Amino acid sequence: MESLMRLVLVLFPFFVVFFVPLDHVSSESISRANFPDGFVFGTASSAYQFEGAVKEGNKGESIWDTFTKEKPGKILDFSNADTTVDQYHRFHNDIDLMKDLRMDAYRFSISWSRIFPNGTGEVNPDGVKYYNSLIDALLAKGIKPYVTLYHWDLPQALEDRYEGWLSREVVDDFEHYAFTCFKAFGDRVKYWITFNEPHGVSIQGYDTGIQAPGRCSLLGHWFCKKGKSSVEPYIVAHNILLSHAAAYHTYQRNFKEKQRGQIGISLDAKWYEPMSDCDEDKDAARRAMDFGLGWFMDPLINGDYPASMKSLVEERLPKITPEMYKTIKGAFDYVGINHYTTLYARNDRTRIRKLILQDASSDSAVITSSFRGGVAIGERAGSSWLHIVPWGIRKLAVYVKDIYGNPPVFITENGMDEKNSPFIDMEKALKDDKRIGFHRDYLSNLSAAIRNDECDVRGYFVWSLLDNWEWNSGYTVRFGIYYVDYKNNLTRIPKASARWFQTILSGSSSTSDSSKLILLEEATEQQQEYKFQEK
């Protein structure tokens, strides 16, 4: 009986999340008042997607510079981010937009190859000067910087030298890079994020090969010249965990006492809903969570990989030694969650997918889908992978609370895209009611997770302030609450969603009707106001 009770206590959180339905919350209005005092609202970006100026300021090349030039066919419109939205030159204007929206914070990333053009060696003073200027400009407007150290753009020099994240050498180099940033900027930056979406880096860069550095072995290297999809993702993830822990402890030893900052990591996390009520699909949904969020959260919380991963991946999963356990477990002050959508999950009984692909993505023995019985889980956004499922963010928050002990969480990315096409005129693009509804309903569910379920969620970052270059999608989709006119000097024009955020962050409740927020004629007149003026 005693052992049975222990089993019940272990399984209880799992039972609560997957078996007890949460109310699906939808609200016609939402405001800052629906969140606790001190809750942070901000927007998010990354260096490669926003900065441009890839050949200015003595910046070195990154793996994404190389990837877009050597493999342009892997970008939907064959584009690159050489210019993108040119925030490198326009950040003062963009900060004014954030201030106008009443945002509290801005999450951006530092380009490693701007600080160290060769990955290591001499610090580039031009890079330090640029980020000092950006940080100072944010603080001058009362906006807190949340700084990501790595958002996918490894210096190409390190990829050439020792194959980047596949080598244990990268741990020391990342620690040195992090130390340099803490020393240069930590007197003003109090929230650091070591890595953005390490799961995405591992799978998309080293399993499917659709993102930099483009390594895979699918169908006998049909898609990639180099790589091993069943092994390399696990090595990369392991080295990223060690690098994160090294940066965390470097901060604790050298900077924490004086700077009083916090160190986190941003993990991409879908919610997985069982396809049916049968036990095998419920187990599959839990495995999907293990192979996604749990791949990194379990080591940080418990000091080891999830049991399901150790069982299914076996010897291909690197071992966390007792020494690593001491370093990795508890190596965070908060967790960032990047959440966009929810999928159905069912058990892969036949394992044919695994037999054919021989890759890490099929190790979990889970098949996911946005459809059940021919019905979509939610309305589709611009991209086929993104369906709008607001209740998923609440279930995810409760899962993190119940499974991982309710750590401090920031939603470091949430947003939706719409198609960018020459056949969509500006007037239609500015009237983005769907985006307003998306954020209203996701925020309503997040508020319920905080107020009703007692989840320790402390902030919400919109992806994104501006339309921008979106990795494999290039410029074919728009995530911004500001429209970027790519044909007219990269002019920033507020969409209805921008004015909606301005209203709710000013303390007022707001409807989702864009006609009550901003007239499209007014938005057109405001183009001149937001045009770039050289400083």
From Swiss-Prot:
Keywords from the named record: Disulfide bond, Glycoprotein, Glycosidase, Hydrolase, Signal
Gene Ontology molecular function: beta-glucosidase activity
The keyword Disulfide bond belongs to this UniProt entry's keyword annotation: yes
Annotated InterPro entries: Glyco_hydro_1 (IPR001360), Glyco_hydro_1_N_CS (IPR033132), Glycoside_hydrolase_SF (IPR017853)
EC code: 3.2.1.21
Signal peptide positions on this chain: 1-27
Classification via Pfam families: Glyco_hydro_1
Disulfide linkage: C216-C224
Binding residue positions for a beta-D-glucoside: Q49, H151, N196, E197, Y340, E413, W463, E470, W471, F479
Glycosylation sites (chain numbering): N118, N445, N489
Gene Ontology BP annotations: carbohydrate metabolic process
Domain of life: Eukaryota
Reaction(s) catalysed by this chain's protein: Hydrolysis of terminal, non-reducing beta-D-glucosyl residues with release of beta-D-glucose
SUPFAM superfamilies per UniProt: (Trans)glycosidases (SSF51445)
Positions annotated as active site in the UniProt record: E197 (proton donor), E413 (nucleophile)
PANTHER family linked to this entry: GLYCOSYL HYDROLASE, LP05116P
Family membership: Belongs to the glycosyl hydrolase 1 family.
Name this polypeptide is given: Putative beta-glucosidase 41
Record organism: Arabidopsis thaliana (Mouse-ear cress)
Highest classification ranks of the organism: Eukaryota, Viridiplantae, Streptophyta, Embryophyta, Tracheophyta
